[in-house]
């Protein structure tokens, strides 16, 4: 993408900037449902993927299909026309959003790591994703502090994505508020990824584990987690990360029918997978993955000179996919 076009997109999308990480706390959500429609306000054409009521006002969760940014806004601010999911895919077929969905679906037969696993082609750097699965341990704050300290002179706020589960949010309000504070202080720019509500794990084979466990209710895992995110002032992104990176063709299809793009990883550090240029790096920040955290801190140390010379950067997952599919 040419620099002039990138600047133009950033300027035109200013209403999204600053609202895609967190917003108001919606603590009286009712009638929350999957609802697709074209939403038009002036020259702005967005895709609504959710509708809900809060304090007797109707809201929409909106997606910019070109930049993959999301925001929540009053439904009354837009002229809307409802769409069925096949029509969504047809209407926005040339957008990075639909192309990313199609790319993710192409890997839906994999039991592990289905979805997008490589973000930024031919770029020097990575897209960092940090998973917050349920845990009784405190947040590994050193990860976020290290990112800010390393990149503050090069990229501020530093972009990263957090895959957050419902059970983690319920038990770690102080840590969640601390993360939101980093965004408010303009230290980090966080993309919030849905990581399911319960994130159940058992001792069964992977084909019957995580979201593939018998009795799993995807409406609860997806929509209740989004509601909890909104209650905590987090704006859900268009991304979904499968717990354990485990899925099958059916669950991938169902997640995409919610309008969400499955995101995997080609560099799970704790498993010894080293990142390449454009990798989507995965570490756990929930206190349960000491090896992955140490490996990431060491990676930052090894890349210090490249960071200072702007030869190794953190990339926003959304912008990386926009570059990949905006062709």
List each language-model region with its residue ranges.
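Terminal accessory/targeting
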Residues: 1-129, 139-141, 145-161, 167-174, ...
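Active-site metal-binding loops of divalent metal-dependent hydrolases
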Residues: 130-134, 196
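Short acidic donor-binding/metal-coordinating loop in glycosyltransferase active sites
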Residues: 132, 242, 285
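Metal-dependent polysaccharide deacetylase catalytic core of the NodB/CE4 family, i.e.
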Residues: 152-253, 257-282
């Amino acid at each position: 993408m040419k620099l002039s076009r990138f600047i133009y997109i950033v300027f035109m999308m200013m209403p999204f900037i600053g609202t895609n990480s967190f917003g108001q706390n919606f603590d009286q959500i009712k009638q929350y449902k999957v609802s697709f429609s074209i939403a038009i306000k002036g020259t702005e054409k967005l895709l609504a993927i959710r509708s809900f009521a809060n304090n007797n006002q109707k809201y929409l969760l909106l997606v910019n299909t070109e930049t993959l940014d999301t925001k929540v806004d009053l439904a009354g601010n837009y002229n809307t026309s409802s769409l069925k999911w096949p029509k969504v895919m047809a209407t926005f077929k040339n957008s990075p959003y639909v192309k990313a969905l199609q790319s993710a679906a192409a890997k839906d037969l994999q039991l592990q790591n289905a979805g997008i696993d490589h973000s930024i082609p031919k770029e020097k750097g990575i897209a960092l994703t940090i998973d917050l699965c349920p845990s009784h341990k405190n947040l590994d704050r050193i990860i976020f502090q290290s990112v800010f300290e390393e990149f503050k002179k090069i990229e501020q706020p530093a972009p990263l994505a957090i895959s957050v589960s419902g059970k983690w949010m319920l038990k770690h309000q102080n840590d969640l508020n601390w993360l939101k504070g980093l965004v408010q202080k303009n230290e980090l720019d966080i993309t919030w990824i849905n990581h399911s509500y319960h994130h159940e794990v058992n001792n069964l084979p992977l084909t019957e584990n995580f979201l593939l466990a018998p009795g799993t209710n995807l409406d609860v895992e997806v929509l209740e987690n989004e509601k909890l995110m909104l209650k905590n002032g987090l704006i859900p992104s268009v991304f979904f990360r499968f717990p354990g990176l485990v899925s099958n063709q059916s669950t991938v299809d169902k997640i995409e029918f919610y309008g969400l793009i499955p995101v995997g990883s080609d560099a799970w550090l704790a498993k010894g997978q080293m990142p390449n240029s454009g990798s989507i790096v995965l570490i756990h920040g929930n206190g349960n993955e000491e090896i992955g955290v140490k490996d990431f801190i060491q990676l930052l140390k090894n890349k210090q000179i490249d960071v200072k010379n702007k030869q190794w950067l953190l990339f926003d997952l959304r912008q990386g996919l926009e570059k990949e599919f905006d062709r």
